[in-house]
Amino acid sequence: MLPDFIIIGSMKSGTTTLYRNLSAHPDVDMSREKETDFFVAEKNWRLGLDWYSGQFLPQGTRKRGEASPNYTKSRDFPGVPERIAQHCPDARLIYIVRDPVVRAESQFRHSFLLGALDDLDMATFEGSHGYHHIVDASRYAHQIDAYLEHFSKEALLILDFDRLVQSPQMVMDQVTAHIGIAPHPIDGLGLHNDSAQLSRVPAPILRFAHSSTGRALADLVSRETRDKIRGFLAKGKARKTPPFSDGLRASIRRDLSADTDRFRKITGQDFAHWQV
């Protein structure tokens, strides 16, 4: 059993909210793990199709879906669109985006809290691998280029995070129409802020949880149990992240300007509220 639709990103743009709202739909079977990362060669591709199929219920008529923001991080994880097209050629794709600068800043905070920026020096951050890793995920036009080589524009639904916040039911109705199921009322928005919770979990525990051993142990318990454990652990004092300077924001706007203009042309959406 392979997915009928895939939320391909972008990171820190509401993919968890989409995943949870779709999980509550009676005609949808979302993957056991929200982020299967199956089509990422550097992550779970080696586990094979049997493992991936096991993320979904073995039978039934419900639409199957998953949500892996790493599917739109081509700088670090190339080849994802080709693998999806090979095994799920008829999949409906969903790509939710937000202000590219705000998204990059949110990913920066998230990465810092996970310990991915332990050697961070803000004086030399611009131009570093960490900088390009974060900015690349906001190059929305570049990220969908390879997808549009294998899928039609009609197969790709582009959503705006701010519209999801302002009109959640309308956006979810767009999603259900795109994947071919009846609309379903949502119970509020339920925006999920990982970083706010992560900031209160002790750093050593976070590092273990995101290690291969930690992920393997997490597979042994239900999603509801994992949420309860994380909520229990998130009782400490919130850790602070380094300030994001106006100069750094200006550099990101400069570096993303051309790509963002091209994204507007591809999608036909103006995204007038964005900083770039």
Label each PLM-derived region with a short phrase:
Residues L49-S53, P81, I144-D145, T260:
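Generic structural signal for well-ordered alpha-helices
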Residues K34, D145-A250, R254, G268-V276:
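The conserved 3'-phosphoadenosine-5'-phosphosulfate
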Residues M1-Y19, S23-M30, I84, R92-I96, ...:
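A generic "structured core" feature
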Residues F39-L47, Y71-F77, I134-V135, R163-S167:
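Acidic-and-aromatic substrate-binding clefts and catalytic sites of carbohydrate-active enzymes
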Residues T16, T72-R75, V101-S106, V165-M170, ...:
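Short catalytic/ligand-binding loop motif for oxyanion handling, primarily in non-cytosolic enzymes
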Residues E82, D90-Y95, V102-R163, M170, ...:
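PAPS-dependent sulfotransferase catalytic domain
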Residues M1-T72, R83, H87-A91, P100-S106, ...:
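PAPS-dependent sulfotransferase catalytic core
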Residues A67-T72, T124-V135, P243-L248:
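Surface-exposed cleft-lining segments at the edges of enzyme active sites
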